[in-house]
Amino acid sequence: MKEFDINIRIKVKQEDELSAMESILLDKARQATYRSYSPYSRFSVGAAVELEDGSIVAGSNQENAAYPSGLCAERTCMFYANSRYPDSPIRRLCIAARNTDGNFTLRPVAPCGACRQALLEAE
């Protein structure tokens, strides 16, 4: 049996520590939360990716009554980026979320297992 480790690195920074591009990505991810369709969880998530060619793509979570067949913001964003820019790998990803009160979360939002797998396969 062959054994190997799969790791994911997540950087958590304060807003005043972000680079100019990271600030742009955060803004795009926050904007994307307003395009979320989340009537069941009322947890609006947006994601934005910067591609190697400098393009930025954003996406939001999309729910439906046939749970769990909705899509997370990360996969919506990554799948669109891959179909639109197939030759430009993802450089970095930013995630933003608003809670049921409509306020942005103060704690980081980590990708779910399905999104982590999609990220792993996108590398």
Annotated model-derived regions:
Residues 58-123:
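Zn2+-dependent cytidine deaminase-like catalytic core
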Residues 42-51:
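Short beta-strand scaffold segments in enzyme catalytic cores
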Residues 27-34:
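Short Pro/Gly-enriched beta-strand edge/turn motifs at strand-loop
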Residues 35-41:
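Extended beta-strand/beta-hairpin segments
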Residues 41-42, 71:
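Short glycine/proline-enriched turns and hinge-like loops at secondary-structure junctions
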Residues 1-27:
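Short, compositionally biased leader-like segments
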